[in-house]
Structure formats: C-alpha cells, structure tokens
Amino acid sequence: MVIYEGNRFVAICRPGLLANYLNQVSPEYKGVINIYEGKAHYKINAVVARELAFQFLTFASCDIQVMGEALIAENEDDFINIFRKVYTERLIMKGAYIQSTAESIETAFRKVAQ
C-alpha cells in the first residue's frame, strides 16, 4: 500500500501496518489521505483516519456506523477491509463516533470484484 497526505508521499507499507502509519499522520494535516493498493484507490479524511487508527491501536478494535449498523474491526484484516469495502470518503466524525453519510447500500459499499 502506498500512502499520500494529499499529494505528498508518506510511506509504502504492508497492509498489516496500515493502522500504524495512519496513526502517525501529522495532526496539523486536515485534508484527504490517498491510499493506493494495486489498482484500488481509497480516500479518507485525515482526521477520520487518525481516529480510526487510534481506536484500533489503543483498544484493539474500532467501529464505524454505516446506515445505522456498526461495522467492527477486531483484527488487521477487518481494519483493512473497512477500506476495501466501505466508501471511506463518506466517513465523518460525529462527536466521538465515525459515521458514514451514505443513504443507500450503493453509496455505502464499494463494488467488490467477484
């Protein structure tokens, strides 16, 4: 995976270390983090990415709300699958919670190749 803060290169990392790298993103940066995994491209707000990584590293799990349902990541594969399955560009901070602004399944989840 290749990580950029906006257009500034940050790191190349194994998927299993994604949370560690996202936790180290500069707190002053408020823009979008771009993550490339092969041909896949994921975008996520830097504030949301840091909070998601912080929760995962601190509590050994993190959760997001998508259409009122909680998606919980309890291991590294689950954490990475949040990026692979959910439109992360729709995630926002709502108080202390991370929530998707999607209103339908089509706008909440990415199409996964069969």
Swiss-Prot record:
It comes from the Viruses. It is an enzyme of class 3 (hydrolase). Keywords: Bacterial host gene expression shutoff by virus, Degradation of host chromosome by virus, Endonuclease, Host gene expression shutoff by virus, Host-virus interaction, Hydrolase, Nuclease. It comes from Escherichia phage T5 (Enterobacteria phage T5). This is DNA-(apurinic or apyrimidinic site) endonuclease. GO terms for molecular function: DNA-(apurinic or apyrimidinic site) endonuclease activity; endonuclease activity. The keyword Cell membrane does not apply. Its EC number is 3.1.-.-. GO terms for biological process: degradation of host chromosome by virus; symbiont-mediated suppression of host gene expression. Performs endonucleolytic cleavage at abasic sites, which are generated by the base-excision activity of host Ung. The cleavage generates a 5'-deoxyribose phosphate and 3'-hydroxyl end. The sites are specifically recognized through the formation of a complex with host Ung. The viral endonucleolytic activity damages the host DNA, blocks host DNA replication and induces cell division arrest. This may provide an advantage for the phage and save nucleotides for the viral replication since it specifically targets the host DNA, which possesses more misincorporated uracils than the viral genome. Belongs to the apurinic/apyrimidinic endonuclease family. Interacts with host Ung; this interaction allows the viral AP endonuclease to localize to newly formed AP sites and cleave them, leading to inhibition of bacterial growth.
